[in-house]
Structures are given as C-alpha cells and as structure tokens.
C-alpha cells in the first residue's frame, strides 16, 4: 500500500502553519506550538483525520458519488488537476465562478456551449469561417475550457467538495453549505474549521504537502471504485524531530 507516514508529511512541511499573529483561535486544538513566530501543526492529529477523509471518500466513490476537487491557488492547481483527472473526478483549478453550485442551471448552459464549440472545432468548422469570426470563437472556447473544462462531465451537483485552502475558496465552501453538500477541507492555522465537515489540519501553501493530501484522496477514490481496502495513511506514529526547512522560511515571508 502507498501509505503516508509522519515523516513524509514532515519532510513536505505539512506541519508549518502561518505566522502566529495571523492565527485563527478556532484552530488551537490542532496546533502543537510555535517556532520562530510560526505555528506548528500537530501532525499526530492530522494523520488520523486524513485517514478519516480517505475512508469517507472511498465509501462515496464505491457508491458512484461525485466529489468535486477545488484548488485555484498556485500551490494547488497542478495537483488538483492531475489527481482529479487520475481518479475521474470533476475539478476547478482556475477560478471559482460565483454561482457554480447555487446557480448550476445557468452554469450548465455554459457547459453546453463549451461542448458545442469543441464539437465545431473537432469537425473543422472553424476553418470554414472568416478569420475574425474563427478567432472570436476560439477565444470563447479557450475561456470556457479554462473555467469549466474540469466540470464539463460532472452531470449535476457533486455529492461532496474537496477543498484546498478553505479561506481562499470561501465562496465555494459557502455555496456548498447553502446546498448542504458535505465539505472536506485542508485547513491551515489562519482559517476556521467551522462549517467544514471533514477537516485536514495542515499547511496549504506547500506544493509538496498539498500534493500529498490530494494524492491520498485520489488514491482512496480509486480504491473505492475498485472496492479495495482503504489504508492510505500510516498509523505508525514514529517520533520524528521537527526541524526547520524552506517551508518555514516561505511562511515567515508573509
């Protein structure tokens, strides 16, 4: 099994929170302490909570549920896109459009337009148009692809949301809560875990750490689809000394 250990999370800098002056007191139960004015996240809490998430998404996937991956900040975009595609789930990696969930009927019309333009391009119809018209339609297609390409085949509202950085993606979280769609969220020390059904306390700015969370969720979804046993997160609570690295320096530059 491709387990995730405490050491792997530490090496990825998953334990580095934000500067202490930016903290959200509601995250206090997940904070181990501080170093150089940066909060240290207690990974002994992160590991079992990540395990709870993988078990949950595996059960959802086994029942053919749709889980929408959301991560539009630079540290998350590539991982969200790569792993969502790998496990066959919809995703938003560019910019969350207001009403993407709460006004899905309108969004669906844009998705129909996206499919229409893609079909026209595949059939070579753009080549038969005057240059200006073809250019306008190409730009429209690119814009729709960037905004809606990841949810093109979602086919309706998702059964759950998986969000990297619940503060940055607060509009997505609010829309999901309004529609009573469960939210799984990576929550750093500067954000609130309130209204997040499944919390993953962890660094949401480290690309390596984010990739671990997203990979674990995608692997669990694939396991669920294949009806395999979930065991992605190691329960081995080996002692590993917390050391400073580039992630701490990155956080301190806020």
From Swiss-Prot:
Single GO BP term: translation
Protein's UniProt keywords contain Protease: no
UniProt organism field: Legionella pneumophila subsp. pneumophila (strain Philadelphia 1 / ATCC 33152 / DSM 7513)
UniProt KW Ribonucleoprotein keyword: yes
UniProt protein name: Small ribosomal subunit protein uS2
GO molecular function: structural constituent of ribosome
Disulfides per UniProt: none
Cellular component GO terms held in the UniProt record: cytosolic small ribosomal subunit
Pfam families in alphabetical order: Ribosomal_S2
Keyword annotations from UniProtKB, A to Z: Ribonucleoprotein, Ribosomal protein
InterPro entries: Ribosomal_uS2, Ribosomal_uS2_bac/mit/plastid, Ribosomal_uS2_CS, Ribosomal_uS2_flav_dom_sf
Coiled-coil portions: none
Membership in a protein family: Belongs to the universal ribosomal protein uS2 family.
Domain of life: Bacteria
């Amino acid at each position: 099994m491709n387990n995730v250990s405490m050491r792997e999370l530490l090496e990825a800098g998953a334990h580095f929170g934000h500067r202490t002056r930016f903290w959200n007191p509601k995250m206090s139960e997940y904070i181990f302490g501080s170093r150089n004015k940066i909060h240290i996240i207690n990974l002994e809490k992160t590991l079992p909570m990540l395990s709870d998430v993988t078990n949950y998404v595996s059960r959802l996937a086994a029942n053919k549920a749709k889980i929408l991956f959301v991560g539009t900040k630079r540290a998350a975009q590539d991982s969200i896109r790569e792993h969502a595609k790998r496990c066959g789930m919809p995703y938003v990696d560019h910019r969350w459009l207001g009403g993407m969930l709460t006004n899905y009927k309108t969004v669906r019309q844009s998705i129909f337009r996206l499919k229409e333009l893609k079909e026209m391009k595949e059939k070579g119809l753009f080549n038969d148009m005057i240059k200006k018209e073809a250019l306008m339609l190409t730009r429209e297609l690119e814009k729709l692809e960037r905004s809606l390409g990841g949810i093109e085949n979602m086919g309706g509202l998702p059964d759950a949301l998986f969000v990297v950085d619940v503060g940055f993606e607060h509009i997505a979280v609010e829309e999901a809560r309004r529609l009573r769609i469960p939210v799984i969220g990576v929550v750093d020390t500067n954000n609130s875990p309130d209204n997040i059904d499944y919390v993953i306390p962890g660094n949401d700015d480290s690309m390596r750490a984010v990739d671990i969370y997203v990979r674990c969720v995608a692997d669990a979804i694939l396991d669920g689809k294949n009806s395999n046993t979930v065991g992605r997160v190691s329960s081995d609570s080996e002692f590993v000394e917390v050391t400073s690295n580039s992630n701490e320096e990155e956080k301190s530059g806020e």
